[in-house]
Design a protein with these regions (language model features):
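Conserved MFS/SLC helix-loop-helix module at the cytosolic interface between two early adjacent transmembrane helices
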Residues: 110-149
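Intracellular terminal tails of multi-pass secondary transporters
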Residues: 1-70, 94, 236-268, 443-533
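Structural signature of the two symmetry-related core transmembrane helices
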Residues: 126-140, 353-368
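Helix-to-loop junctions at the C-terminal end of transmembrane segments
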Residues: 110-123, 337-351
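Glycine-rich segments within core transmembrane alpha-helices of 12-TM secondary carriers
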Residues: 183-213, 227-228, 416-430
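Extracytoplasmic gate region of multi-pass secondary transporters
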Residues: 79, 277-342, 399, 431
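Extracellular/periplasmic helix-loop-helix junction of adjacent transmembrane segments
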Residues: 79-110
Length: 533
């Protein structure tokens, strides 16, 4: 068990190397309902703490899960629509379908950075709800498309609409949860992605039987569009904008929830302003670009397989209806991979990068099997396709690295924006690796997938080594052990043992937080802050 080190309130670092880690404390901000500076800590018993955390989980996790489920369904139903007449009804030729797939990410890229600014500045619950109304309307209007131009336009707008969802959910998660809880909670709501794949497959299978003058693919977008629009009302009523106005908690519970993320999270996200010095720090931080590169290389395979999945399955000899059902076991494997790796990453602070390496190995094998499809039975090729299903689990692990290792609202949101620039770039490039001239084998695409994931392994190992070196250097320079479960120096103690939830509750009850502990400070300037890897 690590030992807590008492430090005076006016503690200052004297050496030149340490002085770079300390920033001047600005004037205290206004904190609204949470929490009065320099006051007594919120005292909550261990059983009560577990009950409050469950209450928070049951309020937030279902909402985030369902939102992300619709986020995935509305985006990827295109793959099912493609085998139910969308290409023919919109007269798509040659690479037109690839452009329809990838233009979504141009819209996403266009709105990515502006929306991260708005998430940090606006009431996040209301902003997400209003965005969902627009998003649902765009999905429903896709059914009215009858040309390549119309489809391109509506898909671009869908990218704009959905650009808010992932960054907002990441922001909400880091607002409410500790560094040890973030990977597991991210895994829970991100699993909605794969459950959405199952629901979308069943929906496509059911709607595919409709014999109507309105073709099945149009009904898919109508049903999903209306459902998404209605979801907006639920989010408007139930998602709190911040901890201090969460009406489902009492004032003392809100204080406890706010204190725990200051002690064991990545700091308070309330009453902050956009700080351009944090943007510069993010851009100059080596771990920013290592994580960015890993995200880009993981998303290139995702962009292609996500949009060409049903076409690849159909090439194995299955019809349109069968190809939609075959995606169900694929999605189930994906759910297991996302949930399992999220739980492990939350339980063990040095497993995140190792898990990324482990989950990208099966897709390499799967791509090799599909590439050799002419020499092997269709059943083996289908098995190779199922091996691709662990690849999407890399993104929530990368998100967790960002949420847990970046402190400072502006720095974290800048990194979030960069993360989704990589997400867009990979998903724009991915579909164009599936060349229509190589249909149905797509040799270039599956060769590229193998190369991308091989490079991911190299970069992730480099990131692990870098973060280990930085942790050791900071420990030597600061003279403080620190740990990867706390937010660093808070109150009159540092190195608070937060090995599990009981330690967090004990720390919240005992540590007298000061007004400066709620200030918006980056990870590089937080004494005792150590990185997870």
């Amino acid at each position: 068990m690590s030992t807590s080190h008492a430090l005076p309130r006016d503690y200052a670092v004297s050496t030149s190397s340490q002085s770079q880690l300390v920033m001047a404390i600005p004037e205290p901000a206004e904190y609204g309902d949470v929490p009065p500076p320099d006051s007594e800590p919120a005292v909550i018993g261990e059983n009560e703490a577990r009950r409050i955390l469950r209450h928070i989980d049951w309020r937030l996790m279902p909402l985030l899960f369902v939102t992300y489920m619709f986020n995935f369904m509305d985006k990827t139903i295109l793959s099912s629509a493609a085998v139910f007449g969308l290409r023919e009804d919109n007269n798509l030729k040659g690479s037109d379908y690839s452009w329809v797939s990838s233009v979504f990410y141009f819209g996403y890229f266009f709105w990515n950075y502006p929306t991260t600014l708005l998430i940090a500045r606006l009431p996040v619950g209301k902003y997400v709800a209003c965005n969902t109304f627009f998003w649902g309307a765009v999905v429903g209007l896709t059914a009215a498309c009858s040309s390549f131009g119309g489809l391109i336009t509506i898909r671009f707008l869908l990218g704009v609409a959905e650009a808010t969802i992932s960054p907002a959910l990441m922001f909400i998660t880091s607002t409410w949860y500790t560094r040890d809880e973030i990977p597991t909670r991210t895994g829970i709501w991100f699993a909605g992605n794969s459950v959405g794949g199952i629901v979308a497959s069943l929906l496509a299978y059911g709607i595919g039987h409709i014999d109507d003058r309105l073709h099945p693919w149009r009904w898919m977008f109508i049903v999903l569009g209306v459902s998404t629009f209605l979801l907006g009302f639920v989010l408007l009523l139930l998602i709190p904008d911040r901890i201090s106005n969460a009406r489902f908690l009492t004032p003392n519970q809100r204080r406890w929830a706010a204190d725990r993320v200051v002690i064991a999270g990545t700091g308070s996200t309330e009453n902050t302003t956009w700080k351009w010095d944090q943007t510069r720090e993010c851009l100059q931080d080596p771990k920013t670009w290592l994580i960015w590169s890993v995200a880009l290389l993981c998303q290139i395979p995702n962009g292609g397989t996500q949009n060409f999945a049903n076409l690849v399955i159909k090439s194995f000899g299955f019809n349109s209806l069968q190809s939609t059902l075959i995606n169900i076991p694929y999605s189930l494997i994906c759910v297991a991979a996302i949930s399992g790796t999220g739980w492990i990453a939350g339980r063990f602070r040095s497993m995140n990068c190792i898990l990324i390496v482990l989950i990208v190995i099966p897709p390499v094998v799967g791509s090799a099997l599909i590439q050799c499809r002419r020499q092997i039975p269709h059943g083996v090729s289908l098995f190779g396709y199922f091996l691709l299903s662990t690849g999407p689990a890399s993104l929530p692990l990368i998100m967790s690295l960002v949420q847990s290792n970046f402190r400072g609202v502006t720095k974290k949101m800048t990194m979030t924006a960069l993360l989704f620039v990589a997400y867009c770039g990979g998903n724009i490039a991915g579909p164009h690796l599936f060349k229509s001239s190589e249909e149905p084998s797509y040799e270039t695409a599956f060769r590229a997938i193998m190369i991308c994931y091989a490079l991911v392994v190299v970069l992730v190992l480099s990131l692990t080594l870098y973060l280990q070196v930085v942790n050791k250097r900071r420990q030597h320079e600061e003279g403080i052990t620190g740990n990867a479960g706390s937010s660093g120096l808070v109150g009159d103690r540092v190195g608070v043992d937060v090995a599990d939830a009981r330690n967090v509750t004990k720390a919240v009850n005992e540590v007298h937080l000061r007004s400066e502990d709620y200030e918006d400070v980056t990870d590089l300037k937080s004494l005792g802050f150590r990185y997870r890897f």
